[in-house]
A protein has these predicted regions:
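Amphipathic alpha-helical segments that form the core helices of the histone-fold
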Residues: 25-28, 32-34, 49-52, 101-110, ...
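Accessory alpha-helical DNA-binding modules that contact the DNA backbone or grooves
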Residues: 53, 69, 96-251, 257-288, ...
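An acidic, glycine-/histidine-flanked metal-binding catalytic module
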Residues: 265, 284-387
Length: 387
């Protein structure tokens, strides 16, 4: 087996050793999969490959091996990128079954934390069928799919327009196609009468909602909201996502709330939302349920931003903050670790092999139950240091 499409240039101490190291790495990766599979941990696979490489090349450093590892992992991302494009085509083409097939395959591959080396190997994942496996082989061999490369320009332009329309909050594939078929070709063409009330909100704030939110804006928002909620009393709050992980910006704001008293007062979540509206924090409602709210908030400098507010049970605080903090890769690693222990981890909690929820209410308790130390949010990239 040869994984033949070109890897990017990588830095090795001696340039002439590049080809030898890469070939040895590839041989060892294939050999390792005779013992391990795609469900194994990154640490297991990487350590096995490293030991195999060192049998022939003694002066190779761990960092050099990890650098090549990351390039092979990038192939997984290339597979996902191309399958996402195929899924997008099927969505706008109205092919529901093909959309579902690509969606399942993409989800399965996203859960893999080690390099995929063939379509037949990927087919062992639930959701990857024989047709998609053949496409994966072509991607691994060439770095592309001929069917996409040869796509006519008019088809590409149509997809670009549909993608822009689909970025409007509340506009799904069917609405995007309807707008396109009505003759509209950009955001400015769309009249109010072509959209429902929620979609009009999405269009009104389209530009702001496409922008990343600077950390400073969220920090000021957190200060303002905490002051308001403290007046209500008995409320615990946490802004999760990339903000809690210490990153410089975020796509939207995920605010988690929990009532700390023994019994939640009737309609308490509605009261909270009403107060946030009265204080000028929330300016538009997009959707609202018993425990989840989606809307538009306004920053101190008057910029509209997307916000989701989750009102969670006190006993789920640990699992909910763990889930909504991320990162996505960290959550995948945690779920896979739980599966290897015959358990299930979700935003609702950690469950044993019989489906019983374990009485764990903090992140620390959940992580320790999985055999891990408490991991600070800013270190939650993946579990490679701990698995």
């Amino acid at each position: 087996m040869k994984l033949s499409f070109d890897l990017p240039v990588i830095q090795i101490n001696k340039k002439e050793e590049l080809s030898t190291l890469r070939e040895r790495f590839e041989f060892c990766l294939i050999e390792t999969y005779n013992t391990y599979d795609l469900f194994s941990s990154k640490t297991q696979i990487l350590e096995s490959v490293k030991a195999c490489v060192e049998e022939e090349l003694n002066d190779v450093s761990k960092s050099e091996i990890e650098e090549i590892w990351n390039l092979y992992i990038a192939r997984n991302n290339k597979i996902i990128e191309i399958l996402e494009e195929l899924k997008e085509e099927s969505v706008y083409g109205g092919n529901r079954f093909r959309t579902q097939a690509y969606g399942k395959a993409i989800s399965a591959i996203k859960n893999v934390r080690v390099p995929i080396i063939s379509g037949s190997q990927a087919q062992k994942l639930k959701g990857v069928g024989s047709k998609i496996a053949k496409k994966i082989d072509e991607i691994l061999e060439t770095g592309e799919l001929r069917s996409l490369v040869q796509k006519p320009d008019e088809v590409r332009k149509r997809i670009d327009v549909l993608r822009e329309f689909g970025a409007i909050w509340g506009v799904g594939p069917k609405t995007a196609v309807r707008l396109y078929d009505a003759g509209y070709r950009n955001i400015d063409d769309i009249p109010d009468k072509a959209l429902n009330s929620k979609q009009k909100i999405g269009l009104t704030y389209y530009k702001n909602l496409q922008e990343r939110i600077p950390r400073k804006q969220i920090t000021l928002f957190e200060k303002d909201v905490r002051k308001i909620l403290n007046e209500l009393g008995n409320l615990k709050m946490c802004i999760c996502g990339s903000y809690r992980r210490g990153l410089p910006d975020s796509g939207d704001i995920d605010l988690l709330l929990a009532y700390e008293g023994s019994r939640v007062p009737q309609n308490y979540f509605k009261r909270i939302l009403k107060v946030l509206h009265e204080k000028g924090i929330l300016i538009e409602d997009l959707s609202q349920g018993a425990e989840i709210y989606s809307g538009i908030m306004k920053t101190r400098d008057g910029i509209a931003r997307r916000i989701d507010i989750h009102f969670v049970p006190k006993r789920e605080w640990g699992s909910q903050t763990l889930y909504f903090t991320g990162s996505k890769e960290f959550n995948i690693d945690l779920r896979n670790l739980a599966i290897r222990q015959n358990r299930k981890l979700s935003d609702k909690g950690l469950f044993d092999e019989k489906g019983n929820r374990l009485p764990l209410s903090t992140e620390k308790e959940i992580l320790e139950a999985l055999g891990l130390p408490y991991i600070k949010p800013q270190n939650r990239t993946d579990l490679s240091k701990w698995s």
